[in-house]
Amino acid sequence: AHPMKAVLTKPVYGLFQTMAPHAPFALRVVLNNLWCFGGLLCLLAEKLGGEVNAMMRTTFAFTMAQGSKQINVMPNQAVAGVNVRLVNVDTPESVKTYMEKVIGDPHVSVCVTHAQSATPYASTDNAHWHKLSAAIAHTWKGCLVSPYLMIACSDSRHYTGFCDDVYKFS
């Protein structure tokens, strides 16, 4: 496996800062000192896998493969389909370049059939966020309100063209 580089983006940093006071001591030390342990956390993301890993790097899911119709017959051509979920530091072009470099074979072509950049992060430094946070905290007493990087695709991406900030609720 050749995962792309993990990055500590603003929403993930905010999530970790919100979680820190509620974490067990050792994890609290790490989360309160991301300036020192951020690199370690990025390395651990791959080992932890799952949601933490997906929040910190562009991910790949191989969803389709086609080749020969028979087990014992070599195909003239083989095709694989890959679903890529981008973290904001990556672009469709940078991922294509990365895949070509990792594959390292000029006989294999990487074609982008559909591409959409990651949606922008919503600000947590404005009155809208503070009002939303207060309403959530008021409605669900004791609930932690935190920035979060939604790793699923949603229809909210359609609102980014006419809204400065689109907040997703999970």
Give short role names for the model-derived ranges:
Residues 4-77, 88, 93-97, 101, ...:
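An extended, acidic, His-containing surface patch that forms the Zn2+-binding/catalytic region
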Residues 84-86:
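Hydrophobic beta-strand positions in extracellular immunoglobulin-like domains
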